[in-house]
């Protein structure tokens, strides 16, 4: 994997209308999930003092927020070294993709009977802009649309527990798409599979929608296993 610029956690000062611990937790969790945590080899260390300065609060709510994030598996404390963002091994990532495939497959099955036609149209609209130009010229935009597509299917399943469970997986799942899209014309194949999934949803074919989503996501696991430069 090519070395890239060291990622920096991006946070903004907090307002004080709610618990500072809760606000710090939400801000840090959002910032971590938006980072490219697999984009460079160096471990990502979080500095309490710097976070305190950036968020405009004391170190106590920062420390409490990091404790909550450690309990959820987003960060880990290393004695005498500090707090680090958690990165998974290739085996763990593949296992997480398998779990995601099962959860998103169920969400697609539910969405086929519970979501509205307008919601399916909005899902299809995510890909309208990619019809006329090569995907190779729009990879950043397509990457964002791909993320939105999978998150939307999860939400259309109308199951809050699945939404919650996939949130903690998503930080690692989203990082794999960069690996996947570089290989075997995967981006072009991906959009074709997305459109087939949307077709099954619009047809209210729950069995087919679940099958296509599961196969599509498990294909990502195969790509990661074959090409992913993650720790073993």
Model-derived regions: residue spans:
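Short linear motifs at protein or domain termini
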Residues: 1-105, 109, 113, 226-232
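C-terminal regulatory/effector modules of DNA-binding transcriptional regulators
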Residues: 2-4, 183-232
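A generic short alpha-helical patch detector that favors 3-5-residue windows
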Residues: 20, 95, 99, 115-122, ...
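A short secondary-structure junction motif
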Residues: 31, 35, 39, 130, ...
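Hydrophobic residues in alpha-helical segments
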Residues: 32, 111, 134, 201-202
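A ubiquitous short alpha-helical element
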Residues: 89-93, 108-115, 133-137, 157-158, ...
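Conserved amphipathic alpha-helical segments that form helical-bundle/coiled-coil interaction surfaces
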Residues: 117-178, 192-199, 208-219
